[in-house]
């Protein structure tokens, strides 16, 4: 399988004495679709911020053979690492095709951007097909449905040949059909890329995650398949407030002697 994996060792992020990420280790392999879950404040977004250079961190973060910590954000992006946020950042006045053109660095100037063209670069055409937006390529991005804007933003990463995608709650606010389509999209693009998803939607996670890391208080609490994580008593305690307990044994009738 082609692609590069993400390796994190003893990652720590501290803000004014508060440790938001506390000694995290992760191994995320190419072809994985890894979900990061956990309560609010568990350190999920801060971890991704550290990987992408938005916050200072100690430890080790490697993508393939490349060290990431200490590099500026723009250099990390040039290494094939991209992320999305909960609110899609697209150019709403421009068409879907123009958004992808800009992201791909296709070299079209502002005036030529305004003209339609017959030939579409291969990476742009492939991104349109992969995201299911081919029939909407001439629509302004601002009129797209919420889910379609998220797909466009993912497409803008694909045309840049991003190899590690870090997606922050990509299905927040989506309809059921949009969530299903997004899950299918993530499964397609993760076959030869490394994809990490921060998510709170447990139904979405159960349907599409290939593996799961549960964070709590800045640490990795549990890791494995969906079934393994769901069966972990420590995870149940964090989410339910108590560890799962076996059903109580049925009461055994006790004979009570009648008083004389």
Which residues make up each language-model segment?
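Glycine-rich phosphate-binding loops of nucleotide-dependent enzymes
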Residues: 2-260
């Amino acid at each position: 399988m082609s692609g590069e994996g993400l390796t994190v060792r003893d990652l720590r992020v501290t803000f004014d004495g508060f440790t938001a990420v506390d000694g995290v280790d992760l191994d995320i392999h190419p072809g994985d679709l890894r979900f990061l879950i956990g309560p609010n404040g568990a350190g999920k977004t801060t971890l991704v911020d550290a990987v992408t250079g938005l916050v200072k961190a100690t430890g080790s973060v490697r993508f393939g053979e490349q060290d990431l910590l200490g590099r500026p954000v723009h250099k990390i992006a040039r290494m094939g690492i991209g992320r999305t946020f909960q609110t899609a950042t697209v150019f709403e006045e421009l068409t879907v095709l123009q958004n992808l053109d800009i992201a791909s660095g296709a070299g079209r100037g502002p005036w030529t951007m305004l003209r339609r063209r017959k030939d579409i670069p291969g990476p742009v055409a492939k991104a349109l097909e992969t995201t299911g937006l081919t029939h909407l390529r001439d629509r302004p991005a601002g009129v797209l449905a919420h889910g379609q804007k998220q797909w466009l933003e993912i497409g803008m990463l694909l045309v840049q040949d991003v190899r590690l995608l870090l997606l922050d709650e990509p299905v927040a606010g989506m309809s059921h059909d949009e969530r299903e389509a997004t899950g299918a999209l993530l499964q397609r693009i993760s076959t030869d890329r490394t994809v990490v998803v921060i998510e709170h939607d447990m139904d979405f996670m159960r349907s599409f995650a290939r593996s799961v890391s549960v964070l709590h208080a800045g640490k990795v609490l549990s890791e494995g398949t969906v079934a393994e994580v769901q069966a972990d008593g420590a995870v149940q305690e964090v989410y339910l407030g108590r560890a799962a307990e076996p059903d109580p044994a049925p009461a055994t009738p006790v004979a009570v002697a009648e008083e004389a």
